Structures are given as structure tokens and as C-alpha cells.
A protein has these predicted regions:
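Domain-level signal for soluble alpha/beta catalytic cores
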Residues: 1-315
Length: 315
């Protein structure tokens, strides 16, 4: 099998890495007011350099910054969009483990006006990553537009309905993609847990209780992502990563990709998919028959939920 010369690569990873102890201490010290923002940035820089060196030493063709500058993988980006801010309320999300059930408190966001790109988001993150890699392609990860509009509170936004809001959101993402490409970004990943979550009947039931159409939300998500990607610059690879969540080895949902497969795998205008397949909760490979022939699928077979390394036979 010939090696791939363009992303996504045959051996790749989704991007987020465990924060090293020194960085966790620096974050705690900054929150306590005992170090400055500049000192925290220097600690992040050092941790990112080490993470990139580790990825390149392992032979990976792409490298990320581990998302080391973020408190949360999604709201750090979403709350920097013009017209969206952090809400006062936190959002409880149920978590499941092998023998436990608990709740994760996520930052809530609210829409306060017309959504737009006030300035490129994570531009500084990408610049530093690009300056740090030596052999790998710098890969930036951002939350999918789905993550911004799924629970969006429009009550104080001035929007008459969700269609106009979604159109503005897609346009803001399109502007972000153009800005990142102008900085030299050639490998971008949308993280979209909702495509996986909506396969879970329990999640669809919770969605219905909030007034969301659980039978068609995934189709709406596909349409918004496609609008955001419609005019992306040549030479930019965009993939979509789908998983069921991982917070301290617990997860948010279960179920194969069957429910969303037809719309997502045949219609989503991304270049490839990163699909979690690390245990029986991920279902079978049967839905992959619907993947368009021009798309690349990267199977997430190596779990990050346990420290045990899978054998080649298991994989």
C-alpha cells in the first residue's frame, strides 16, 4: 500500500493530548493569580514544543499543539465568535463509565447579536505550531459549526429564527477558514461530537425534550457544515472528527453510526472522516459502505480511555 503524501495520513491522530503536569501547575497558578499571562504562555509554548517533538519522533506525518492553550476544546473557540459569549449558566452533560454515571459541567454560550468573525480565531495558536514543526504538517483543530448552533440560545440575539442564525454562523466559519488558509494552514479538522451523539436514542430523546427535531438534526448539521466549506481555498484539507466523548476515560454516548450514516457519509463535503471505533459501543463497520468514494476514512482503533496498548491482532 503506497504511503499517502497529503493529509489525512494513514497513521494520524485527532489532536488533543493530556496536559503535562508542569502545564497543569501553570494553569492553576495563573488562576490563583501567582503568575502572569505571559508566564502561562511561556509554559504553554514549552509544553507544545515537547508535544510536537514527541509526535515527530513517533513518525507521525501531522502534528498538533495538543490543544494545550485551551480550557475547553469547543467553547474557547465558539465564545470568540462575534455575537456569541459565555453564558452565566453551566450546562450539565451526563457521563458514563464502565461502572459509573456522573455529570460534566460544560461552559454554556449564548447568542447576543449577529454572528460574525470579529478576528481570526486561534491564528496565534497556528502561527506558533507552524513555527515549531520540523517534519510534520501542522494540523489545527476547531469545533464544528454544529457545536455552536445545537444548543444556541437565541432569545436575546435579535434573530427571528434559526435559519438566519445558521447562515451567519456558516459565513463566519467560511471567513475563519479563509483567514487560516492565508496564514498557511493546509490541514484543518472540525471536531463534531453531535454526529456521533445523535446515533444514541437516549441523546435523541434529550434533544426532543429541548424542542430540537431529533430525526433531522444531523441533516441540518450537514447543511451548515457544507455551507461553511463551500468556498474553502484550494490546497486546504478539511476533515471531520466524530466521537462519543472522552472525559477522564468516561464517555457521553453510545451507538454505531447507522442513524446518521446516509446523510453524513454521502453528503458531507469534507475530505475525510476520523471515526471512533475503539470498542463495541462504536457499532459495526457496516455504515462505512455509504462513504463516498472520494473520501478518506481514518479509523480510531487505538483507545485513549485505558492505558493498555492494543496488540496488532486486536487491531
Amino acid at each position: 500500500m503506497a504511503p499517502r503524501t497529503a493529509p489525512p495520513f494513514r497513521a494520524d491522530h485527532v489532536g488533543s493530548l493530556l496536559r503535562p503536569p508542569a502545564l497543569l501547575r501553570a494553569r492553576a497558578d495563573h488562576a490563583a493569580g501567582t503568575i502572569t499571562a505571559d508566564q502561562l504562555t511561556r509554559a504553554e509554548d514549552e509544553a507544545i514544543r515537547d508535544a510536537v517533538a514527541m509526535q515527530e519522533a513517533a513518525g507521525l506525518r501531522s502534528a498538533t499543539d495538543g490543544e494545550f492553550r485551551r480550557a475547553e476544546w469547543h467553547t474557547d473557540f465558539i465564545a470568540r465568535l462575534g455575537g456569541i459569549r459565555y453564558a452565566a449558566e453551566w450546562v450539565p452533560v451526563p457521563l458514563f463509565g464502565s461502572d459509573t454515571e456522573t455529570t460534566y459541567e460544560a461552559h454554556g454560550t449564548e447568542v447576543t447579536g449577529k454572528v460574525h468573525l470579529a478576528e481570526p480565531i486561534f491564528a496565534d495558536h497556528f502561527r506558533f505550531l507552524a513555527s515549531t514543526v520540523t517534519t510534520a504538517v501542522p494540523k489545527l483543530t476547531i469545533p464544528s459549526p454544529s457545536m455552536a448552533h445545537f444548543r444556541a440560545d437565541l432569545s436575546g440575539s435579535g434573530y427571528a429564527g434559526r435559519d438566519e442564525f445558521r447562515a451567519d454562523l456558516a459565513a463566519a466559519y467560511a471567513d475563519e477558514i479563509t483567514a487560516l488558509a492565508a496564514l498557511g494552514c493546509r490541514y484543518l479538522q472540525f471536531d463534531d461530537t453531535l454526529f456521533a451523539f445523535l446515533n444514541d436514542p437516549a441523546w435523541r430523546e434529550r434533544a426532543a425534550a429541548t424542542g430540537i427535531d431529533p430525526e433531522h438534526q444531523h441533516e441540518i448539521n450537514v447543511a451548515v457544515v457544507n455551507q461553511a466549506l463551500a468556498g474553502r481555498p484550494d490546497g486546504l484539507t478539511v476533515t471531520v472528527h466524530m466521537c462519543r466523548g472522552n472525559y477522564r476515560s468516561a464517555w457521553f454516548s453510545s451507538g454505531g453510526y447507522d442513524f446518521v450514516a446516509e446523510a453524513v457519509f454521502s453528503s458531507l463535503q469534507a475530505d475525510g472522516y476520523f471515526l471512533e471505533y475503539d470498542d463495541e459501543r462504536s457499532g459495526s463497520f457496516e455504515p462505512l459502505r455509504l462513504v463516498a468514494q472520494d473520501k478518506v476514512v481514518v479509523l480510531g482503533l487505538v483507545t485513549t480511555k485505558t492505558p493498555a496498548l492494543e496488540s496488532k491482532d486486536d487491531l
